[in-house]
Design a protein with these regions (language model features):
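ATP-dependent adenylation/nucleotidyltransferase module used to activate substrates
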Residues: 1-154, 174-175
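AMP-forming adenylation/ATP pyrophosphatase catalytic core
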Residues: 123-131, 135-354
């Protein structure tokens, strides 16, 4: 029996369930925890952590013969994730709530809670890897590049990584499901969850109408030359690079080039007018404590599933970092995270400001 005690964050899905099973089957001292993030009366849209999710996680824990606890974190989630999501859209940016959830909810507040419960480590069902050498922890991409989630874990530092365990980091999704069937887990064939877990079956725009009725009003649609082409229904309905749903007819495809919260202007243009080669991230987090040198070429991803580009971090301090791309990227979007890599290693990231 291992001397360490591991809390496994469970969601009722196949990934966290298999992660729990792998740890339990290795003889680890494991207990399951699940965060209650929404009031059970608010599950009419199949939002995350519904009563059904709770029941699934509890059933899996019982089948693995591990203790299971539910932690009420509704207030924290509402304040730090949902309200932040709404605030971002209300102020003209496109936030990534998964980044915020991992930074504050899972790897700060939850980690502190399980440590207080006697755990030495926190495990999750994320697809990522951690290595340790010369007293330094490294966050690596998952072996399965298609499932890799190091992007949303770029907010972690040395302290968090020293206590993080990712049992699925070397596995493919097919292997995970195969393990779930071998373990006879009730969730073996459950569908994957969506990115915006708390939105559920709602379109995010409908969610915003429910939780943020005072979003920016309709305003002008302009081209890059400053000519007005029409009227938009509110900046929250658009994101950089968007093509569909702009509301204009044109012989050539049109894309969202920028959103100006101060003037409430939506600027659109053709694809060749989209993209930048320089941008700024705010409050960058460097996993090893220091940024790459200004002459070191790195890879940057500016959205979770976007293509990566070669870049240089030419200036960085605690408040911001300036990023210069070798070639322009088309989808640099304020509010999203820019995450940096060298080969398989995630160096860290920051929120795109401008």
């Amino acid at each position: 029996m291992s001397e360490r005690k591991i809390a496994i964050a469970m969601s009722g899905g196949v990934d966290s369930s298999v992660a729990a099973g792998l740890l339990a089957n290795r003889g680890q001292d494991v207990f399951g925890v699940m965060m209650r993030l929404w009031n059970p009366g608010q599950d009419n849209y199949n939002r995350c952590c519904s009563p059904a999710d709770m029941s699934n996680a509890k059933t899996v824990a019982a089948s693995l013969d591990i203790p299971f606890y539910v932690l009420d974190m509704q207030d924290e989630f509402k304040t730090h994730v949902v309200d932040s999501f709404v605030y971002g859209y209300a102020h003209g940016v496109t936030p990534n709530p998964c980044i915020q959830c991992n930074r504050i909810i899972r790897w700060d507040l939850l980690l502190k809670k399980v440590l207080a419960m006697g755990a030495s480590h926190l495990a999750t069902g994320h697809y990522a890897r951690v290595t340790h050498n010369n007293d330094v922890y490294h966050l690596l991409r998952a072996r399965d590049r298609l499932k890799d989630q190091s992007y949303v874990l770029s907010v972690l530092g040395q302290e968090e990584l020293s206590k993080a365990i990712f049992p699925l980091g070397e596995m493919t999704k097919d292997q995970v499901r195969s393990h779930a069937r071998e373990m006879e887990l009730s969730v073996a064939d459950r569908a994957d969850s969506q990115d915006l877990c708390f939105v559920g079956n709602l379109d995010y725009r409908t969610f915003l109408e429910e939780f943020a009725p005072e979003l920016p009003p309709p305003g002008p649609i302009m081209d890059v030359q400053g000519r007005q082409l029409g009227q938009h229904e509110g900046l929250a309905n658009f994101t950089i690079g968007q093509r569909k749903g702009i509301g204009l007819t044109s012989e050539k495809p049109l894309y969202v080039i920028s959103k100006d919260f101060e003037t409430n202007v939506l600027t659109i243009g053709e694809r060749h007018e989209l993209g930048r080669d320089t941008f700024i991230v705010q409050n960058p987090n460097w996993i090893q404590g220091t940024p790459p040198s200004s002459d070191e070429s790195v890879l940057v991803r500016v959205r979770y599933k976007s293509q990566e580009g070669e870049a240089f971090v030419v200036d960085s301090n605690h408040e911001h970092a300036t990023i210069r791309l070798v070639e322009m990227l088309p989808d640099i979007t304020p509010g999203q995270s820019a995450v940096f890599y060298t080969d398989d290693e995630c160096l860290g990231g920051g929120i795109i400001a401008t």
